[in-house]
Design a protein with these regions (language model features):
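Transmembrane helical elements of multi-pass membrane transporters/channels
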Residues: 18-37, 141, 175, 208-212, ...
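Short runs within selected transmembrane alpha-helices of multi-pass transporters and secretion channels
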Residues: 73, 142-160, 168-176, 201-216, ...
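Helix-terminus/linker motif at the lipid-water interface of multi-pass membrane proteins
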Residues: 28, 32-53, 122-129, 185-196, ...
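Small-residue hotspots at the loop-to-helix junctions and early N-terminal turns
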Residues: 49-60, 135, 139, 273-288, ...
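Transmembrane alpha-helix boundary and packing residues in multipass membrane permease domains
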Residues: 23, 27, 39, 78, ...
């Protein structure tokens, strides 16, 4: 079945599984980058505790770079799928080309931050000179060679928009395998490679990302033949860029808010470096679980957007129904794994003094996965139906408006010795439950105003 016919005619429940599985695997493998680095770094012979703390502090900026690439890609994905659904091949070529132009701009910004801003950023979160040195070294490498992750994110969405998510997964697998192979070689110094510690972890990560980006570039040029390619389509078009970011900006802000949340949580937990490290390690496990929801969201968005472009009320309704059902099933599985095996994850990271805090965080925060996953699915539905504002509001509630004041207030009781650190972790389930209720109200409004009115 041709890709465009598949998006139009295949039953939505089957289409979502066919598109969703590769995307879920791709997102899970993306989370593996961070977990693998931390696992190998946690088992360094010298300085592993400081190194884990350093990786916790650099993580928000890594997330921010991914946010810029993925957010631009999300806007491109939905707009490209809708444009192809309308049969406008010329505009589709401009959408794809302008997304690559935006990728160049994003890389230049990351490069400049890597050269001039890294030290000030790390020093704002720690006074430990060893942690500062490791954090600066790691983050500078990731920023200067960030073109790999940025363009991988863009090519991934371009392939997903045309129903070729399997190929984006192949690229992700190749990059992950490269990273896993290089990590022990470059961190510990195996064979002719010198021991580089956290620098080795950074180099292994960016080399894997570049490998993925190059492979997806080849797939994009060879397989995405529904629209034209070439430098002429990269010429900036203000109208196209505006449309991309009308959809994608909320996704960028949502991802950026995750970075801000982790950064502020690091500041809140600064009084207890072990709890700070534990939170950073848990967040990587949490990302692994929630990236399952993100991967399914990336199937939900183009399926519903394509149906919206062709004004198919039935396929939109099916996309919403099955998207939520499959998301709930994945999140229940994630909760079961993290609640049953917290000790195994702690052992993987060799978390030392942070072990007790890590297990405590996992026991409490994993309860929120069900509601967090539903919120992610809601946002994918909103984005497909031009609900950028609603998506942004949910992100603000989840990552800023509720979570940070609540965690800050709870931390006062912890610092005064009235309660344990676990009180801070309860801010997460409370936030997700409130946001989920608001998200349901938004979904009812969008269905009434944009779906029920279709013929």
């Amino acid at each position: 079945m041709a890709e465009s016919n598949k998006m139009k005619d295949m039953p939505v429940n089957k289409l979502m599984i066919q598109m969703g599985i590769p995307m879920i695997l791709s997102m899970a493998l993306q989370a593996v980058y961070n977990i693998v680095d931390s696992a190998f770094v946690g088992n360094m012979r010298v300085g592993s505790e400081a190194a884990l703390n350093a990786l916790t502090l650099v993580f928000p900026v890594q997330m921010l770079m991914v946010a810029a690439g993925i957010g631009t890609g999300v806007g491109t994905n939905a707009l490209l799928a809708r444009t192809l659904g309308q049969g406008n091949r010329e505009k589709a070529a401009k959408v794809a080309g302008n997304s690559l132009f935006l990728g160049v701009i994003i890389y230049v910004v990351c490069l400049l931050f890597g050269i001039f801003g890294v030290k000030a950023y790390i020093s704002s979160q720690t006074v430990d000179s060893e942690v500062l040195e490791m954090g600066v070294s790691y983050l500078r490498i990731c920023c200067v060679i960030s073109f790999g992750i940025i363009f991988f994110s863009l090519f991934e969405k371009l392939l997903q928009a045309t129903g070729r998510s399997l190929y984006s997964t192949i690229g992700q697998v190749v990059g992950t395998v490269v990273n896993i192979i290089l990590d022990p070689i470059m961190i510990y110094g195996i064979g002719p490679c010198p021991e580089m510690g956290v620098k080795g972890a950074a180099y292994a990560t960016v080399i894997g990302q570049v490998a993925s980006a190059v492979l997806l570039l080849i797939f994009h040029m060879k397989l995405n033949r529904e629209f034209g390619h070439g430098p002429k389509y990269m010429k900036p078009n203000a109208g196209v860029i505006k449309e991309i970011y009308a959809i994608g900006l909320p996704a960028i802000i949502a991802q950026a808010l995750m970075s801000i949340m982790v950064y502020v949580m690091n500041l809140i937990l600064k009084f207890n470096p072990s709890a700070q490290t534990a939170y950073g390690l848990f967040y990587k496990v949490q990302q692994f679980v929630l990236f399952l929801a993100f991967g399914l969201r990336d199937a939900i968005t183009p399926i519903i957007a394509f149906a919206y472009g062709m004004r198919s009320k039935k396929r939109i309704q099916d996309g919403i129904k099955y998207g939520l059902i499959y998301t709930i099933a994945l999140m229940i599985l994630g909760i079961a794994i993290t609640e049953i095996f917290p000790g195994a994850f702690a052992t993987l990271f060799n978390s030392g003094q942070s072990r007790e805090y890590f297990i405590g965080a996992m026991r409490v925060i994993s309860v929120s996965f069900l509601f967090a996953g539903i919120n992610v699915a809601y946002q994918g539905i909103y984005q497909a139906l031009d609900g950028g504002l609603e998506s942004l509001v949910i992100s603000l509630l989840r990552q800023l408006i509720i979570i940070l004041p609540l965690a800050g207030i709870f931390s006062l009781f912890v610092r005064n010795g009235q309660m344990g650190v676990s009180l801070i972790w309860w801010a997460f389930p409370i936030t997700e439950i409130i946001s989920c209720f608001v998200g349901y109200v938004f979904l009812k409004k969008i269905r009434k105003n944009r779906v029920d009115v279709l013929n």
